[in-house]
Amino acid sequence: MNVKYVPTDAGVRYGQLENGVTYYVCRNPMPKGKAELRLAVRAGSVMEDEHERGLAHFTEHMAFKGSSHFPGTGVIRELSALGVEFGADLNAYTGFDRTVYIIPIASSHLLTGVRILADWA
């Protein structure tokens, strides 16, 4: 089969880390001083067996219950202190073939956002 891919915009930088994580970076001048980080995990409801129903969605929710660098409600507390509110800003969703975590954050706090996504990955 001859598969054709949609070409990537020339303004998008992308690559793959040694651990297999593929990343995409796109500069956007608006809104000024803001960034949106997303982690898309290839795990969704269609990949679950009958006895695993709901596991991807459950895992999505558990990410907000703590991580290596942010135990307990540390993720929510840390981001809230930076002006990112859980639910209104900080969010996630589980689809058929993916789970996506979304962190809109001030550009000056990118390292914190990346550290959280690294824990979740």
Model regions: which residues?
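Divalent-metal coordination cores built from histidine and acidic residues
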Residues: V114-L117
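A common structural junction motif
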Residues: D119-A121
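M16/MPP (pitrilysin/insulinase) zinc-metallopeptidase core fold and M16-derived inactive scaffolds
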Residues: E36-P104, S108-T112
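N- or domain-start disorder-to-order transition segments that initiate the globular core
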Residues: M1-K32
